[in-house]
Amino acid sequence: KKAAAQPDKIYAKEEQVSGNVVPAVEMTGVSFRYDKNGGDILKNASFTVKRGEICCLLGGNGSGKSTMLSITAGLIRPYEGKIKIFGKRLKDYKGDSLYRGILSMLPQDIMSVFTGDSIEEDIEFHCRALGMKKREIEDRKNNVYNLMHIMHLKDRHPADLSGGEQQKCAFAKILLSEPDLLLLDEPSKGMDAFAKDELKEILLSLKKSGKTALIVTHDVEFACSIADTCALLFNGNIAASGTPQTFFSANYYYTTTAGRISRGLFDGAVTAEEVISLCKARLNQH
């Protein structure tokens, strides 16, 4: 199996606030509703994503996870609260500056990302829209093709791809602007176990290059394997957050299969690898 290609640019900004690195995302007291006369989807929600981490946001259907992602991306506006991206108020990013090297979003509706009759056409059109010259276009598209392992898909129509292949190609497209912050809505949807492992390698490679990722997911096993921090959105606010170890071991509903099976036997174990290791250690004691 080939190792994932390394991203070609390192993002490590040095802004400081009181000696601490500025968070990638700061959401403070945010409230949002779709209908003026309807109920709040987010209720005075506050949330922070540290620079350079992978944060997974979990919660039930309709809990507001995708809404929080869209607010972070500046696609919809809350009626109350403040959002900062890398220390700068969201409203202070003028024009399309937010989407040129600052952040990119992978939406849940993957097909909405594609506009061309082939992946290659789509990628090239987006490169031109970003103002790239011919040489840069070739370099950039080959970089994302190799990183996402989709060179063999470039001449295919997006509608002819499997769900997992569409995810990878859409992800490649949002990487073209070389964003510091990745907002990913269900990125492992439609992927088999092999493709998920490949995606995990890619995300860890991007993290190593300095990227930050906020990932909305229902896939607790994937979240446990990739996240630095997990957070639970419930009743319009962040109900719990922590490392995967503390988050999943303390949660009775949103937890891994390994954590559920081993509860009471190996408290605190949340991955299959941890349970296997503890089982072997116990056997060796007898």
Regions found by a protein language model. Give the residues of each.
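The feature captures the beta-strand-to-loop junction immediately N-terminal to the Walker
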Residues: 58-60
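Helix-to-loop junction immediately C-terminal to a conserved catalytic motif
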Residues: 73
